[in-house]
UniProtKB/Swiss-Prot annotation:
Protein family per UniProt: Belongs to the IRC6 family.
Protein task: Involved in gross chromosomal rearrangements (GCRs) and telomere healing.
The encoding gene: IRC6
Species annotation: Candida albicans (strain WO-1)
GO terms under biological process: vesicle-mediated transport
Keywords: Chromosomal rearrangement
Protein name stated in the entry: Increased recombination centers protein 6
Length: 275
């Protein structure tokens, strides 16, 4: 089977291996922590859900090789990385990429650096599109904020970073969290897993669905919904559903039409599962 490819790009100590480990569950990844440079690492993984099976190559790259680089130096190296990435030499890589995760260290990366870096990420996104339609790319981009273990980042700073990322039309994921937020949406580590599992991959093998099991699950879900409607003691959580829909609609405004369609389908599936 032809593998799919995603790229995790970041500076040293920004969470790249943690993300790769989360996606692949590769036991060898912790051993890579001792490797001085992570540029050029490839983690091979297989992903199986109840609907499909696929193979995935997780490409890891660093635009900066020094942990103590200044903001100016890091931006210069990120821009240099982008210039190489958009060149004809890397055309084949751009064609096979299904996703990009850009990692930042929320403890050490300054707000000004993140703001300027996001502008370069926008240029990288454009380089992944078709030449005639700059935004016609079916992949995903997420900005993942990490924090070194046993250290804390202030909530106000995290919100400021998230607002900057969202204003660029990109998704922000805080690697330090997990579970669900108040809108019943996956966040942090669980959102990364969900993002990978729900993506419309280029190469995959669909699994046969047991029609009897499908009908059984559907009837069980319908019965559960009916009980919530007729039983006064059962709460349907309509407020949560409406809140989720409003939040999804606001987020969709920053997406392209193709991205909106995929996002809408994902939200519908989540609401059905929630019910």
């Amino acid at each position: 089977m032809i593998p799919n490819h995603i790229l995790i790009l970041g500076s040293p100590n920004s969470g790249k291996l943690r993300i790769a480990n989360l996606i692949s569950k590769n036991e060898e990844i912790p051993n890579l922590e001792d490797v001085e440079l992570h540029s050029g690492l490839i983690v091979k993984a297989s992903l199986r859900t109840k609907y499909y099976f696929l193979k995935l190559n997780i490409l890891i790259d660093e635009y900066s090789e020094s942990k103590g680089a200044t903001d100016e130096k890091k931006l210069s190296e990120l821009h240099k990385w982008y210039q190489e990435f958009k060149s004809e030499e890397f055309g084949e890589l751009r064609e096979v990429l299904d996703g990009l995760m850009f990692t930042i260290n929320m403890k050490t990366d300054s707000i000004s650096f993140i703001r300027d870096a996001l502008e370069i990420i926008e240029q990288i996104k454009i380089s992944l599109g078709d030449e005639e339609n700059l935004h016609d790319w079916g992949g995903f981009i997420a900005v993942v904020g990490s924090c070194p273990e046993n250290q804390i980042v202030e909530d106000d700073l995290i919100l400021e970073i998230e607002d900057m990322v969202l204003s660029q039309g990109l998704e922000f994921i805080n690697l330090s969290t997990e579970g669900e937020n108040e809108y019943k949406e996956k966040q942090g580590k669980d959102r990364i897993v969900e993002l990978i599992e729900s993506h419309d991959w280029t190469n995959l093998e669909m699994l046969k669905v047991d029609s009897k099991q499908y009908e059984t699950n559907k009837l069980a879900k319908m019965e559960s919904m009916k009980q919530k409607l007729i039983n006064e003691k059962e709460e349907l959580d309509l407020d949560d559903i409406f809140s989720k829909l409003n939040l999804a609609r606001d987020h969709a405004q920053s997406l392209t039409q193709d991205e909106r369609d995929k996002y809408a389908n994902k939200v519908i599936e989540e609401i059905i599962d929630f019910l």
